[in-house]
């Protein structure tokens, strides 16, 4: 079993609800959370700025050698998810799925 942690980030503290649910569903997994409270909220910022912040958040989490990253931020999930998936060699998941 891969014992590396799963990294989770949000633009603030709201993503702790995702961490709580992940811990409930996968109690054997180690989780690392980063809440970017210094720059919250991300909403209202340009797409380039959001993508830059998200890259920095992922870079920080990557320093812990995670096996996957969960973006617990709707703004980043809808703005930068595709970029982050392309730029990383580990799975990157968002919290906002496709809608009809």
Where are these regions (language model features)?
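Non-catalytic structural scaffold of enzyme domains
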Residues: 1-100
């Amino acid at each position: 079993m891969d014992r590396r942690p799963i990294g989770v980030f949000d633009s603030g503290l709201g993503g702790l609800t995702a961490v709580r649910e992940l811990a409930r569903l996968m109690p054997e997994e180690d989780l690392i959370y980063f809440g970017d409270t210094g720059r919250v909220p991300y909403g209202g910022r340009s797409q380039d700025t959001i993508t830059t912040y998200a890259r920095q958040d992922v870079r920080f989490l990557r320093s812990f050698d995670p096996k996957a990253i969960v973006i617990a931020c709707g703004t980043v999930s809808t703005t930068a998810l595709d970029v982050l998936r392309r730029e990383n060699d580990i799975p990157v998941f968002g919290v906002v799925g496709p809608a009809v």
